[in-house]
């Protein structure tokens, strides 16, 4: 009896409600999942296709749409379903395939036509060497042959190839000994590099024989730019010496780095030895430049910054009432700081007009109207405001 507990005990009013987890609504994920699209949609009977027994194997691609029959009843009770849609005609299917192939092809349909047009234009265009008909006369045959091998491998320029090949045969198999070549002039050639030792020998002795040799060699090797400009006259048959006599011979030659070196005073030309010392004016200018350079040199910074203590007034006053002062300076009364100072009048500092007034009066002239208005405005009289002009006038009279 003692173990038995009363089943119907009095409960508090809050105990009759549902627990907290029952009041919580279901999650939104479950509600959304109901309206979610299924992975496998329901079967559509309009796309059913009945096939033969031998055509249900798809190892070698899709079966042909022809000869589709219903399977035998003794073997299968239900039809076999394929999810293919209604098949189109073979002709329209070929057109669609051609369109897809054209889209995914690397070459556009207009590119082959453009390629053929470019090839035809290249065949119609002239050869690059056809613009120079006299190319064989101006170039040596060896260089011309190398150029033809690179630019004309198809042997379109038959005359040039025949000229080069015939020239090669004559060079390889000379029938008669060639006569000795005449001395060729060294015009329009690059100047040879003269070593420093050769120039040193030329500069040590300035004898007339050496100078003549040097001038002859330069005249023989180099020509002026004017001769190069009158090349057209030489082609017409004009004599070269007659053109040279009309103009002065001014050969141009630039020294190379090999010729530049440090030389002693003895090796200098006699004209340069007289200019070793400076003139009086040059010495004065050089001395002034040295003094000016010394002035420009900055003196060493001997200033050292020192720490200075600052204060802003008494601590029990407002910071606005204080003023920045050094620690050794006395404090300023805050009441004086609160009082606004009078705005300074510009005319108070005009000492010049007053002195001008005294000067005019001392000479016996009338006072200008501007100065009279100024004195009336400030309340000045001629005797109250005195300037040292009166005393100065007495001394100089």
UniProtKB/Swiss-Prot annotation:
UniProt cross-references to Pfam families, sorted A to Z: FAM47
Domain of life: Eukaryota
Family to which the UniProt record says this protein belongs: Belongs to the FAM47 family.
Name recorded for this polypeptide: Putative protein FAM47D
Lineage: Eukaryota, Metazoa, Chordata, Craniata, Vertebrata
Recorded name of the encoding gene: FAM47DP
């Amino acid at each position: 009896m003692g173990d038995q507990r009363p089943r119907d005990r009095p409960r508090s009013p809050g105990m009759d409600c549902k627990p907290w987890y029952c009041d919580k609504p279901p999650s939104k994920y479950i509600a959304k999942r109901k309206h979610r699209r299924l992975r496998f949609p329901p079967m559509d009977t309009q796309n059913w296709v009945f096939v033969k027994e031998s055509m249900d194997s798809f190892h070698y691609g899709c079966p042909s749409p022809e000869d589709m029959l219903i399977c035998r009843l003794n073997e299968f009770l239900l039809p076999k379903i394929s999810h293919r849609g209604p098949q189109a005609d073979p002709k329209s299917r070929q057109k669609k395939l051609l369109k897809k192939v054209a889209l995914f092809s690397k070459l556009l349909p207009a590119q082959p036509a453009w390629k053929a047009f470019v090839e035809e234009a290249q065949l119609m265009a002239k050869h690059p060497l056809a613009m120079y008909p006299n190319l064989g006369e101006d170039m040596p045959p060896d260089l011309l042959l190398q150029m033809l091998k690179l630019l004309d491998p198809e042997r379109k320029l038959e005359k040039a190839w025949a000229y080069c090949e015939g020239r090669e045969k004559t060079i390889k198999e000379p029938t008669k000994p060639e006569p000795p070549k005449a001395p060729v002039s060294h015009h329009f050639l690059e100047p040879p590099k003269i070593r420093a030792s050769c120039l040193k020998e030329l500069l040590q002795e300035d004898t007339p024989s050496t100078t003549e040799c040097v001038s002859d060699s330069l005249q023989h090797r180099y020509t002026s730019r004017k001769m190069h400009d009158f090349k057209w006259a030489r082609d017409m048959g004009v004599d070269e010496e007659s053109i040279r006599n009309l103009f002065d011979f001014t050969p141009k030659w630039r020294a190379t780095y090999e010729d530049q070196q440090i030389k002693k005073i003895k090796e200098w030309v006699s004209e340069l030895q007289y200019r070793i010392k400076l003139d009086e004016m040059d010495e004065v200018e050089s001395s002034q430049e040295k003094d000016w350079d010394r002035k420009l040199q900055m003196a060493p910074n001997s200033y050292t910054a020192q720490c200075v203590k600052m204060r802003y007034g008494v601590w029990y006053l407002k910071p606005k009432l204080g003023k920045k002062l050094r620690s050794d300076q006395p404090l300023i009364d805050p009441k004086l700081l609160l009082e606004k100072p009078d705005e300074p009048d510009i005319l108070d500092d005009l000492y010049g007009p007053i002195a001008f007034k005294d000067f005019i009066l001392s000479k016996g002239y009338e006072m200008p109207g501007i100065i009279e208005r100024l004195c009336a405005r400030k309340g000045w009289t001629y005797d109250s405001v005195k300037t040292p002009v009166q005393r100065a006038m007495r001394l100089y009279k």
